[in-house]
Amino acid sequence: MIPGTLLGMALMLGLGACGKPTEAEPIQLDGRVLATFFPLESMATAIAGDAVEVLCPLPEGADPQFHKPTRAELALYQRANLVLTNGAGFERWLASASLPPSRVVDTASNFTEPLIEHTGMTHSHGFEGDHSHAGTDGHYWLDPLLAREQARRCAETMSSAFPEHAAAFAAGLAQLEADLDGLHERFATAIPQGTRLIASHPAYDYLARRYGWEVHSLDLDPEAPLSEEQFAELERLNGSLEPALILWESEALPATRESLESRLDLRSVVFSPAENPSAAQRAQGATFPDILAANLKALEAALGEK
């Protein structure tokens, strides 16, 4: 048996050999700006130019509202100098994410107009599983004037984080504002007030409020056939509203489009929310204003053919 004094000395020596417990290493920031989805990535890229790298870790095909980032994606956010978010609780994962509040930017924080609320319903699209659209509608980036406010908030916080690039950011913002102002003028003049539309998804209410459209939103999956119940609801709306068109976030099934047109004289138009463009669109270099402009062109053309 080892005497108590010797045992104590042995333990002290053992602890000394192990060294003192070390504190967690501080996260080394990587000098990048991260955005939670494409519209903010596109805006920040337009503002930054070549001055700062902008990245969006959202995988292709994922819904930014309901996607749960992987550990690798979270690590990218944690190392970023700034994380640009849509705000209004749009990105559900942010409520439980461990990110420093000082580096997370709510790009809707300067809005003066009230946000739209939905009662919503639970449904499922693709691999994201069941989810609900109840609560605050976060699709305000589709309104060019609200998108402009988000862009200004991006530029403001980017200039604070990277003051050496403030002049470049101001120039980038000025061009982006001009693009968004031009889109606003085109929407205001090209689509008549009072235009009646059915929407396959509750994504267009800010546009409707801005430009005086009448939009009735459903929750239809463009990749799934219409059920008899859904078709009956569309038939009812078609008879009561006499809508011009039905808007889809992405291309509906050919059978769905043909059935709606032949049975209800209801034409389908793709009006992309630009949340997460395809790899092909990205390869073509499409920007957020580009996608909005393409949406407007498609809607205007379809209305002209009615």
Regions found by a protein language model. Name each.
Residues 1-16:
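Sec-dependent bacterial lipoprotein signal peptides
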Residues 18-306:
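Extracytoplasmic metal-acquisition and chelation regions
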